Amino acid sequence: MLNTPFSPWPSFTEEEADAVRAVILSNKVNYWTGQETRSFEKEFAAWSGTEYAVALANGTVALDVALKALDIGPGDEVVVTSRTFLASVSSIVNAGAVPVFADVALDSQNFTAETISAVLTPRTKALICVHLAGWPCDMDPIMDLAAEHDLKVIEDCAQAHGAHYKGRPVGSIGHIAAWSFCQDKIMTTGGEGGMVTTNDRQLWADMWAYKDHGKSWEAVYEREHAPGFRWLHESFGTNWRMLEVQAVIGRIQLRRMQEWHAARLKNASRIWAQARQLPALRVPVLPVADVHAAYKCYVFVRPQALKASWSRDRILNEMVARGVPAFSG
């Protein structure tokens, strides 16, 4: 975080601090003893317009477990945007598959059905759609293309909490969505955290089990057990569970999302309106049916319109020198 007069981010209040203290003093601090994470999963699924959610330790493992549930592995190719954070790509490599980069559109900076189609091969098994900076991918043509080629679609919503595509929340359109609650994201669960959402019960069950050493929800919660029953592992997995202290923060921040989203859009709109008045800057226009999450506020420089001695980097440096957070990339 730059040393600026602007409000700090992440932003916590006494409400989060008191809630975390209550969880710790309850001694019910993980998924198996507390109820905060289970409640957070239900509330986040409802908020994102999906049937199911699995809370996780961070957003990177959300991508990992999504690929695992879709049985992505050696010999498979996954098409991913050429403009994204490393985790969208490294998760594919860590699954043993091959990332294939598709070009992005000039305005949205997202890949499109056309750029995806150009790199498909018989080995392509899935797509990772990154809603970069909060601008939704054009999902209808992408889903049509996926259906035509029998491909699975993961929505990477790490930067898009609150964005909508043609009236639908992002994350509710593909087969699985992966979310991040890292400290710099639109909402955070105390520094790290993640979630996967889906409308497919089998995918949910597979992800829920894998993140908890292969325990089955059905085996643990829906069967009768003799006294003294502990755990039944019906498959192998790992431990990517979210902590109760993370979940209680997430529940509080989720309740603030409507207010925060409105504030983000208001601030972004003011920046974009001013930038449009400057001939050396270009501001893309979002499709009217979509809603931006305003995680980032992109403005593009027209180098040919700059005065002598000016460049993108000088513009950034001048803004930072005046205490305005500004970055490239």
Residue locations for each model-derived region?
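Conserved PLP-binding catalytic core of the aspartate aminotransferase-like
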Residues: P284-G329
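Basic phosphate/pyrophosphate-binding loop/patch that engages nucleotide-derived ligands
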Residues: L120, M143-K152, M195-K215, W310, ...
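PLP-dependent aminotransferase-like
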Residues: K68-C157, H164
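N-terminal "arm"/small-domain region of PLP-dependent enzymes with the aminotransferase-like
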Residues: M1-V29, L232-E234
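Hydrophobic/aromatic ligand-binding patch that stacks against planar heteroaromatic rings
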Residues: S90-I92, L145, P169, I186, ...
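Active-site region of PLP-dependent enzymes
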Residues: A160-K166, I173-K296
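Phosphate-binding glycine-rich loop
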Residues: S26, N30-E77, S91-N94, F101-D103, ...
